Amino acid sequence: MHKSTGYAIIYVVRRNAVLWADKRYHSLDYEMKARYGHKIYKIALDGGFTCPNRDGLIDTRGCIFCSAGGSGDFAASRNQSITEQIEEGKQLLVGKQVSDSSQVSCYIAYFQAFTGTYAPIDRLRALYTEAIRHPEVAILSIATRPDCLQPEVLDLLSELNQIKPVWVELGLQSIHPQTAAYIRRGYPLSVYDAAVLNLHERGIEVITHVILGLPGETADDMLATADYIAHQPIQGVKFQLLHVLKGTDLYTDYLQQPFHVLTLEEYTDILIRCIEHMP
């Protein structure tokens, strides 16, 4: 079973005849260097959230592929303050001896674990403000569900977007209803569309997450998802290879009735074709 951790984040821009550094697509790394003059690193944070797909509002099982950590397995402990998590994340980057580490002066504070807008508004304000006010944080990025962007949350994000750029990362995964039902996404495509429009109207940048290789999906299905999001007013897309993680219901399904998991070559091929659908 192939379980690569590879992904590609594409910053969506109009296609032209030039190369973006050494790539033929506009990568997030290229965009950040163009904006800030050097590499920007993401620090994963855990705000102590849960998810309506876990607490019983929608379901109690979570999305079928989601780990016990709510996809925040690389975040620091939620028992630490946000500032402490940022400082720990900085030390991890230094410890890895990343290239051009002397330039590490700006970070993306990324609320990654569970649903990053699913909490009382006062708590969200406190968490986000602590992150965005950190002197070395350049961008506040929040992973969330499209159905967890109530008007008061949108107003808060708009307010913070005046201090530093705010990104919202939406877990769409697929546009196909049958797939959405299987992975227990818990909301229809129309909710995603409305969330993107609401964020766009407020000048908040949106990154859409898509999983390539979901069970039952063909190459044409994946390309249809890529084509759909390419026509939305979003600024980026993260193409993620399907992970079959131990302890998830997806892993149980795989053990009981193994499904095809993309090989590295298949993933590379479909990823290239998806990128070609970007504007």
Q: Each predicted region: which residue ranges?
A:
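Conserved SAM/AdoMet-binding glycine-rich loop
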Residues: 100-187, 194, 201
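Auxiliary Fe-S-binding modules of radical SAM enzymes
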Residues: 13-30, 34, 39, 236, ...
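Conserved C-terminal portion of the radical SAM core fold
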Residues: 190-249, 265-279
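Glycine-rich tight-turn/loop motif centered on a GG-T
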Residues: 178-189, 253-261
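Short amphipathic alpha-helices and their capping/turn segments at secondary-structure boundaries
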Residues: 89-95, 149-163, 194, 223-233, ...
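Conserved, mostly hydrophobic/aromatic
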Residues: 63, 111, 170, 237, ...
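Short, positively charged and aromatic/hydrophobic N-terminal segments
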Residues: 7-10
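N-terminal [4Fe-4S]-dependent radical SAM core
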Residues: 2, 12-108
